[in-house]
């Protein structure tokens, strides 16, 4: 660049985008727009210590016609990057001028001159993270940079650079040596003297020294502005962002902030006014660098980077794929595959090989084969891959696509240009093992998990803004604002700009919050600052499932990041950016339901001695379809919600295809067109099946028969196009995609071809129009049948387990919800409904997790508060080695020191885990502290190996006479207190419930069950009357000084949060106390994913004069009192819930023993119940 243009232009090279997280406030798109407005030909990006934004910056700048100059403001270790000590160069009095981060790093500005230099920056930033991490800083050193210096331009950097730091410390010789070192590393043409002027003393103090070094070493000057935001008026947004980073408020005089408002993209005239006279050539150097920087296009050129699967000698990947598919078909069909299977497989292989994907299929098959060999449960298939017979033969999927009508072309076809996408579900507890296996197999430098970026979203921006302006009181204002926002749609709030933009589609919905902004100055201030924060990147995270794999070291293609907290290697770019350059992305998904299935199968093996193979269970199991028809699907994969259970009851599924259909239909699109109810009604002959057009009745009969004349699946659209318009299935897939995109010009072109094809087959214009008009809206929501079938199989398996092995399945389900006490309460209530008793934890019987014991479930010790998995493991090992505990003294004598602490012991006592030893809980509580103290000394001696000096049994079992005994008092807490402590430790009432004895009376006075509200059966704003016991009462004061309270209201079936706002609290506050049994009239409040109640009033019922109902007596000879018979009886009783107590009369000759059954088995004595009991136990079972 020369002439007048050079003398008037400028290029900003030192810029921090939002990828300098919580420090840079410059979004890339606005930054490029400002560069274009300023008429600058190029712009640089130098984020702090990372290259996360390189891909977005390159693509956006290139699209805008602006040359991108990609760099990084690197952190340089003051010594070796491997040395994690903090090193200071000056004396203690110079601390403020010394190495940044209290001795952690200096800065160095680095830019890529070409593609080679950019790849070297990828390597440098990656190794800085791998090897130089100190606190939050990824640090390089001179040795590392020297190894990867080719194609890199560096500068002395900002005032925190090494040279400037030495100058501030008065170490002029060391400053000169540092400059000479860096100049030698990159060469004299690639080292520049970086000069900044933001009016800061720290800059002026070293300027003369810098210029002197520049003259001595012939280093050209380079003018930069340390840009952290785009325009001067965005300085306030940047101040706010720094407060978000540091947790400070704007009013804090000691907060970290930038001095002045000059850290923006200044015009060329502004920059030249600063520098042209003082340091001639400093601005021109920016243009020189911009001119020298060559295209980076090669870095972003897509190329095949898929790992090449190793195959035996004599094979290539294609021939080995054929071999493996053939072997797989023989394995799947020992008597030989059915007609047409080999032809279908051969066709699929031809397509796979023609697209260059045989290695991909072999890689996926290898991953799944390893998982199965390691006992890691794998899903039967998800997404369109379930339509591939090759995938089925290789064991990638477990669904035969042909009998289910699944299409390979929906997954892969000759017309498709993109990579196939096979997502894999694994047991979620063991997903990490699969990532490690992939890294071990293909190279730890070639496999990485994938980065994600968390942005400051609408509500978070408002809350952050409120806090930094007003501190803690600001949260109340933010709460008012967020509650006034329109409801989120698909978990997305209206953007803040849309609130005041009349052109935004949701503008009218935002009238309430707009009113607050217009009338309340505090709200307006918060809103304006929040707009500047919204959308900025807050942090980097890891994608839940994506994994990137490459045939070459990943740092040859992208930057990497080592996550400090666990050492995981993560890509520096998100997965679309990685895929765009040809890297292989796979999704390793952790599916909780596979974990539940695995636990349930383990429970069945332990409890019944049966090894279940779910892949072999029949798909026509009667008990499973009866369970589905009853809607008893709480905890069943995909079929759990209240409306879904209602749909199942309407549908009455009778085959696996119904399970697939219900998963496809239960979504907003089909439900909006009432397709889910139409399917149920047509299946059960409540609605006639009408053809789309008389001419189409016969041609489409076979395609639409399984869905009763409705178009439910995308595959049906493809088959229809094939049948009536003579499309190939590959072309039909293109039609399907076009219909889903709804672009008018594309649809018109597709209709033309579709119409021509139908006309050629003799269909009338009326039939063509009728079909097109039917397909078009259905195409928008028709579901991928392959995916529905894959997930339908998991749904069927979980339903099968619940129907046939209820205790084992529910134990797995309870284990899976962990600390989610709300979910656990719902599932415990379902256990009661199923006739399953949930037993308290027990030091002699419990394992770590919930476990099935006969027809009941035993609480796991790991579910007890303050009792960790390591402690439980130690306790179980002791029990296994030394036998069960006979009493509390024996327990303390036997357990390892790691389990012998007061907190653990107290928690186990309160949870009832020692009940089976015959001690009262209160008695144990009174003595446990002194008891633990008494044995700790001995156990510490044992741990040091000293106790053996005094002898143990000759056999080495260590069961000498107890060294400690204690007398436990018989004192016991009253039931109410005992249950309260139990709930404190377990989150739930287990051994009993405060409502036992009155729950039936309470139920008679309410109109809505709590689970119905939580399941979404009750609409927002509905008025309900509920009852239960109050827990976790939390009294608060609002910003106006008015008291209010929140509490958990629990009955025997679940719990829900209730808000008692000031107008209600003022009348009923005295009755809002823990453990109070109450009736509440309330309004349902649904906000985002949260459901709560807003109380209108409260009543404390009086049950003192309640009429006692006569128990229902059921007689059973003791010879019939078998496990199966009692289990069946409990299930019958659970199907007829009510308020009547049940007495079981056990008859043995002339002796009759009467047992009062659990409160959870109260019934309604209806004719239906009497009939069920007589059918199960015989006609004489109801005699008195």
UniProtKB/Swiss-Prot annotation:
Xref: InterPro entries: DNA_pol3_alpha_NTPase_dom, DNA_pol3_alpha_thumb_dom, DNA_pol3_finger, DnaE2/DnaE/PolC, DNAPol_HHH, NA-bd_OB_tRNA, PHP_dom, Pol/His_phosphatase_N
EC id: 2.7.7.7
Keyword Nucleotidyltransferase found: yes
Keyword Nucleotidyltransferase: yes
Primary location: cytoplasm
One BP annotation, GO: DNA replication
GO molecular function annotation: 3'-5' exonuclease activity; DNA-directed DNA polymerase activity; nucleic acid binding
Subcellular location: Cytoplasm
Catalytic activity: DNA(n) + a 2'-deoxyribonucleoside 5'-triphosphate = DNA(n+1) + diphosphate
Keywords associated with the record: Cytoplasm, DNA replication, DNA-directed DNA polymerase, Nucleotidyltransferase, Transferase
GO cellular component assignments: cytoplasm; peptidoglycan-based cell wall; plasma membrane
Family label: Belongs to the DNA polymerase type-C family. DnaE subfamily.
Binding partners and assembly: The Pol III holoenzyme complex contains at least 10 different subunits organized into 3 functionally essential subassemblies: the Pol III core, the beta sliding clamp processivity factor and the clamp-loading complex. The Pol III core (subunits alpha, epsilon and theta) contains the polymerase and the 3'-5' exonuclease proofreading activities. The polymerase is tethered to the template via the dimeric beta sliding clamp processivity factor.
Function statement: DNA polymerase III is a complex, multichain enzyme responsible for most of the replicative synthesis in bacteria. Pol III also exhibits 3' to 5' exonuclease activity. The alpha chain is the DNA polymerase.
Protein name in the entry: DNA polymerase III subunit alpha
Gene name of this polypeptide: dnaE1
